[in-house]
């Protein structure tokens, strides 16, 4: 079994490649939930939904979010009434979020609700939220005010000067992971930290109490999301700078170096040298390239 740490864009492309090699039931995905939010009475978990739509064959792989061919009748109807959602939800996608919100209101944990929804979609892979706590990433603006990550990236398109990134739990308690996540790490043949944003996608997972300790005893590989000083996608460069790290593969390695046995850097990333890094083609522009990267990556894993 392989466990993958994932956000919502770069890593699902790698998971698509892994699925050409492994059976779905051999893959566990630990998913970032620090970009979740309550919206329109719904509990929206974008990264979890991207992963479960990928496994169920529903994902829109042009945008890498939402359901392929979904309609937006409800979203546009609300716009006419003067209410515009921060995150545009398709109608079928909305059904997922309605169900999740109701399950949580009934007293289910996010782990339980995720399992129930995945079962409904016929997913045999195991999809685990990183935590059952309600947690969010906030950027720290220049005036010291806090802005939810979704407002920063979706609402403001990242056009805000920031100087920090923090995590806040609703219950005010330290962020902790779940027993299911720890078991998945310990029982895996290895863990892959995918090429998602190190600050807002992978960072929250690693900050969950118990995760870094569990990784110390499991072979762990990480794939850099950077080529040069630019991420393949998303706002990782600005966020890394605000977090106090170089917006490069070297900066990413500094975030992960205490938990990784193998660090993968793109073959084109010639200006940056990371100590001990291995070079692979990490540009997953199509399914074949994703499969090729997955094969190469798994070849490094120790046989059990």
From Swiss-Prot:
It comes from the Archaea. It is an enzyme of class 2 (transferase). GO terms for biological process: F420-0 metabolic process. Homodimer. SUPFAM superfamilies: CofD-like. Its EC number is 2.7.8.28. The keyword DNA repair does not apply. This is 2-phospho-L-lactate transferase. Its cofactor is Mg(2+). 7,8-didemethyl-8-hydroxy-5-deazariboflavin binds at residue 49. Belongs to the CofD family. It catalyses: (2S)-lactyl-2-diphospho-5'-guanosine + 7,8-didemethyl-8-hydroxy-5-deazariboflavin = oxidized coenzyme F420-0 + GMP + H(+). Catalyzes the transfer of the 2-phospholactate moiety from (2S)-lactyl-2-diphospho-5'-guanosine to 7,8-didemethyl-8-hydroxy-5-deazariboflavin (FO) with the formation of oxidized coenzyme F420-0 and GMP. Disulfide bonds: none annotated. InterPro entries: CofD, CofD-like_dom_sf, FbiA/CofD. Gene3D superfamilies: CofD-like domain, CofD-like domains. One of its GO terms (molecular function) is LPPG:FO 2-phospho-L-lactate transferase activity. Keywords: Magnesium, Transferase. CDD domains: CofD_like. Pathway: Cofactor biosynthesis; coenzyme F420 biosynthesis.
């Amino acid at each position: 079994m392989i466990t993958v740490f994932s956000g919502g864009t770069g890593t699902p492309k790698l998971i698509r490649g892994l699925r050409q090699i492994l059976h779905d039931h051999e893959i566990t995905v630990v998913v970032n939930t620090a970009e979740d939010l309550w919206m329109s009475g719904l509990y929206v978990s974008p990264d979890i939904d991207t992963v479960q739509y990928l496994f169920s064959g529903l994902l829109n792989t042009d945008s890498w979010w939402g359901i392929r061919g979904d309609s937006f009748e409800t979203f546009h109807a609300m716009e006419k009434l003067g209410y515009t959602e921060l995150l545009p939800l398709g109608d079928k996608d909305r059904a997922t979020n309605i169900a999740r919100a109701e399950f949580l209101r009934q007293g289910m944990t996010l782990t339980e609700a995720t399992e129930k929804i995945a079962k409904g979609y016929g997913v045999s892979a195991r999809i685990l939220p990183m935590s059952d706590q309600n947690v969010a990433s906030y950027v720290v603006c220049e005036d010291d005010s806090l802005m939810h990550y979704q407002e920063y990236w979706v609402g403001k398109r990242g056009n805000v000067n920031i100087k920090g990134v923090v995590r806040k739990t609703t219950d005010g308690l330290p962020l902790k992971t779940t027993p299911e996540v720890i078991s998945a790490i310990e029982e895996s043949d290895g863990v892959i930290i995918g090429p998602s944003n190190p600050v807002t996608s992978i960072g929250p997972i690693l900050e969950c109490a118990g995760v870094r300790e569990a990784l110390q005893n499991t072979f762990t590989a990480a794939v850099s999301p950077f080529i040069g000083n630019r991420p393949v996608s998303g706002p990782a460069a600005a966020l890394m700078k605000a977090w106090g790290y170089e917006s490069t593969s070297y900066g990413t390695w500094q975030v992960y170096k205490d938990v990784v046995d193998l660090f993968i850097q793109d073959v084109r990333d010639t200006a940056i040298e990371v100590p001990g890094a291995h070079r692979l083609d990490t540009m997953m522009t199509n399914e074949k390239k994703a499969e090729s990267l997955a094969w190469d990556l798994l070849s490094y894993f120790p046989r059990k």
